[in-house]
Design a protein with these regions (language model features):
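A short LG(V/I)-centered, amphipathic sequence patch enriched
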Residues: 42-61
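Central regulatory/effector-binding core of bacterial HTH transcription factors
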Residues: 92-155
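Hydrophobic hinge/microswitch elements
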Residues: 130-135, 139-142, 149, 203-256
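Flexible hinge/capping segments at coil-to-helix
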Residues: 157-195
Length: 298
């Protein structure tokens, strides 16, 4: 048995309007068409649905039950239309973002606040890790988009779009700087991120470019740990400028002067937006990308 939805709609309109004539006018159909719909329902279910001799019409028990259930059907229909319409406009749904550690900690919140303001009904989850881990999550379908530090080599299925540049600055604790000569950076202890992180890759590029070969390296799993070890005076590190500005301002850290080391105490890297090349860009991902690329920093 298939429900005749047009007949159900006519039945509900008769009950709500109180008469066949008003129901016909509201639905822009003839009164005989309304009567035919009611007869069709009564024949289908083999029950009498209403007493037509009264105005407004009086429903039987079966009619009351059908009216309640039909209203539920049409209310669900409205919810479906509204929900899917809003999803097509990126106003509902969920977005899973993968962000490398520095971006998740220091960049992303500014843009998530604005995105949530524009699309308050969208659920957001953020997974963080080093850049290789984020690329793996993307390929496994565990995130919708990624924002990472640097490129991902040898990954043809990942599309990379440059988002912005970030400066990493060579810093140390004031007492470390006072107690060590900067003429031989290879002899000093370096604090670095783990293999696979964008920060570790850029630090290695800096060391290679300047022919620095540290004899002692301490590797840790996140930039906050690097920062704390540097503050404690354990060694040198390249850290994101956005992360150390206040520490330098409060004299907890110092930027190594170029005059002491004979080279620029910083290096720039690209922060990138990554998606899968074969995945269709949904309106939700498109709108998050628009916020990320175009909403200005305060």
């Amino acid at each position: 048995m298939r429900l005749p939805f047009q007949a159900l709609r006519a039945f509900v309109e008769v009950v709500e309007a109180g008469s066949f004539t008003r129901a016909a006018n509201n639905l822009f159909i003839s009164q005989p068409a309304i009567s035919k719909s009611i007869r069709e329902l009564e024949a289908l279910f083999e029950v009498k649905l209403m007493d037509r001799s009264h105005s407004p019409v009086i429903l039987t028990d079966a009619g009351n039950a059908l009216f309640t259930l039909s209203k539920n059907i049409f209310n669900i229909e409205k919810v479906i239309i509204q929900d899917l319409s809003q999803r097509s406009q990126s106003r509902l749904g969920s977005l899973s973002i993968g962000a490398s550690t520095t971006i998740a900690s220091h960049w992303l919140s500014h843009y998530l606040v604005e995105f949530s303001r524009r699309y308050p009904a969208v659920s957001i989850s953020v997974l963080s890790g080093n850049s290789q881990h984020i690329a793996k999550l993307l390929k496994n379908g565990e995130i919708d988009v990624g924002v990472i530090e640097g490129p991902i080599p040898n990954e043809p299925e990942i599309q990379i779009i440059n988002w912005r540049k970030e400066r990493l600055v060579l810093v140390a604790a004031p007492h470390f700087l006072e107690g060590n000569t900067m003429t031989n950076l290879s002899a000093l202890k370096w604090i670095m991120r783990e293999e696979g992180s964008g920060t570790a890759r850029v630090t290695q590029e800096y060391l290679t470019k300047l022919a620095i070969q540290p004899v002692s390296i301490i590797r840790v799993a996140n930039n906050l740990a690097v920062l704390e070890l540097v503050r404690a005076g354990l060694g040198l590190a390249l850290l994101p400028e956005i992360m150390i500005k206040e520490k330098v301002m409060h004299k907890e850290l110092v930027v190594i002067p170029e005059t002491l080391i004979g080279m620029e105490p910083f290096i720039e890297r690209e922060l990138n937006w990554i998606t899968l090349t074969w995945r269709h860009e949904t309106p939700l991902r498109k709108n998050f990308k628009e916020v990320l690329f175009n909403f200005p920093l305060a």
